[in-house]
Curated annotation (Swiss-Prot):
Residues 28-258 form the Radical SAM core domain. Homodimer. One of its GO terms (biological process) is biotin biosynthetic process. It comes from Francisella tularensis subsp. novicida (strain U112). This is Biotin synthase. InterPro entries: Aldolase_TIM (IPR013785), BATS_dom (IPR010722), Biotin_synth/BioAB (IPR002684), Biotin_synthase (IPR024177), Elp3/MiaA/NifB-like_rSAM (IPR006638), rSAM (IPR007197). [4Fe-4S] cluster binds at C46, C50, C53. It comes from the Bacteria. Pfam families: BATS (PF06968), Radical_SAM (PF04055). It catalyses: (4R,5S)-dethiobiotin + (sulfur carrier)-SH + 2 reduced [2Fe-2S]-[ferredoxin] + 2 S-adenosyl-L-methionine = (sulfur carrier)-H + biotin + 2 5'-deoxyadenosine + 2 L-methionine + 2 oxidized [2Fe-2S]-[ferredoxin]. Its EC number is 2.8.1.6.
Length: 313
C-alpha cells in the first residue's frame, strides 16, 4: 500500500467509501459493539511534553494528580465496569517508563483484573522486551501505545520521546505475543497528508494492530493545543472518511471511537459506526476528561439495534 493509494481510497465519493467499508466490516465482524472501560491508575506529573495532554508535568492544568492507586480500589472499578457491561478494562498511567518500584504491583493488578473475567489492557509508556514478557506472563491481553500522528508532524507535538521509540515499544509488545493497540489523534493541526502518513505507519508496524483507537483532540485549557484551539481541527465528514479508510485498510481490527466522542452528535456517531467503528470507551470518564455518558450510549445503541460483544458471549 502506498500513500497515493491511501489518498485515492479516502477521496472516493463518500457514499461509495462508506459502502465499501461497511461491506468489509460485515465480512469480518458481527453486528456488535465492543465496550471498553478506561481508568487512570496514576494521574499527572508526566515528564513528557505532549502538547495535547493535561497530564504533562510541563503544563499548568486543573487535573487532580495522584500516585499509583491501590490494588483494591482499581479492582473495585474493574468490577463495576464488568457489571455495567464492559468486556475490557484498560488502565492508563502517566509515565514515560514504568518505574521499577511499581512494576510488580501493576503486574499483580493485571492478573487480578484478568481473574475477574475481563480482558486486560494497559498503557504505561515505553517498555523493554523483558518488561513486555513479564506483562504477558501476568495475563495482559493488549498493550496500548499510540503513534499519535505522522512521523513528519510528530516533532510539532512531542519532543521528549522520539517516534522510533514508540515503534520499538510496539515491537517489544508484539514479540511478547501481546495484542497491539495503536492509533492516533486527529484535529491537532495536522494536514490531510499527515493523516494518510499515520495510516501508512500503522500498516508498517512490526505487528498489525488488533485494536485502533481513533481520537479527536480535546482542547484542555493550560496545554499548548488547548490554548491554541477551542475545538478539534477536523469536521465530521473528514472524520467519517478517515474511519472508513481505516476500516478498508484494517479489515480485522477493532476500530475504537475514543477521545472527543462527548462532543459529537448522535448522528455523527452513527455515521462513524456505519463507516467501521465497532468499539467505544464506555463510562462517564475518559482518564481525566469527560466521556459520552452511559445513558447517552445506551440510548444510541438501542436506537441502532446494536448489542455489546459482552452480551453476545
Amino acid at each position: 500500500m502506498t500513500l497515493q493509494q491511501i489518498k485515492e481510497i479516502y477521496s472516493r465519493p463518500l457514499t461509495e467509501l462508506i459502502l465499501q467499508a461497511l461491506e468489509i466490516h460485515n465480512k469480518n465482524f458481527g453486528n456488535d459493539i465492543e465496550l471498553c472501560s478506561l481508568k487512570s491508575i496514576k494521574t499527572g506529573t508526566c515528564p513528557e511534553d505532549c502538547k495535547y495532554c493535561p497530564q504533562s508535568g510541563h503544563y499548568n492544568t486543573s487535573i487532580e494528580k495522584h500516585k499509583l492507586l491501590d490494588k483494591d480500589s482499581i479492582l473495585a472499578e474493574a468490577k463495576n465496569a464488568k457489571d455495567a457491561g464492559s468486556k475490557r478494562f484498560c488502565m492508563g498511567a502517566a509515565w514515560k517508563h514504568i518505574p521499577k518500584k511499581d512494576f510488580d504491583q501493576v503486574a499483580e493488578i493485571i492478573t487480578e483484573v484478568k481473574n475477574l473475567g475481563l480482558e486486560t489492557c494497559v498503557t504505561l509508556g515505553s517498555i523493554n522486551a523483558d518488561e513486555a514478557t513479564k506483562l504477558k506472563q501476568a495475563g495482559l491481553d493488549y498493550y496500548n501505545h499510540n503513534l499519535d500522528t505522522s512521523r513528519e508532524f510528530y516533532p510539532e507535538i512531542i519532543t521528549t520521546r522520539k517516534f522510533e521509540e514508540r515503534i520499538e515499544t510496539i515491537r517489544n509488545v508484539a514479540n511478547a505475543d501481546i495484542n497491539v493497540c495503536c492509533g492516533g489523534i486527529l484535529g491537532m493541526g495536522e494536514s490531510l497528508d499527515d493523516r494518510f502518513n499515520l495510516l501508512l505507519e500503522l500498516l508498517q508496524l512490526p505487528a498489525a494492530p488488533k485494536s485502533i483507537p481513533i481520537n479527536t483532540l480535546i482542547p484542555v485549557k493550560g496545554t499548548p493545543l488547548g490554548d491554541k484551539y477551542t475545538n478539534a481541527q477536523i469536521d465530521s465528514f473528514e472524520l467519517v472518511r478517515f474511519i472508513a479508510t481505516t476500516r478498508i485498510l484494517f479489515p480485522q481490527a477493532r476500530l475504537r471511537l475514543s477521545a472527543g466522542r462527548e462532543n459529537m452528535s448522535l448522528e455523527t456517531q452513527t455515521l462513524c459506526f456505519l463507516a467501521g467503528i465497532n468499539s467505544i470507551f464506555y463510562g462517564n470518564k475518559l482518564l481525566t476528561e469527560n466521556n459520552a455518558t452511559v445513558n447517552s450510549d445506551n440510548f444510541l445503541l438501542a436506537k441502532l439495534g446494536l448489542k455489546s460483544n459482552a452480551e453476545l458471549c
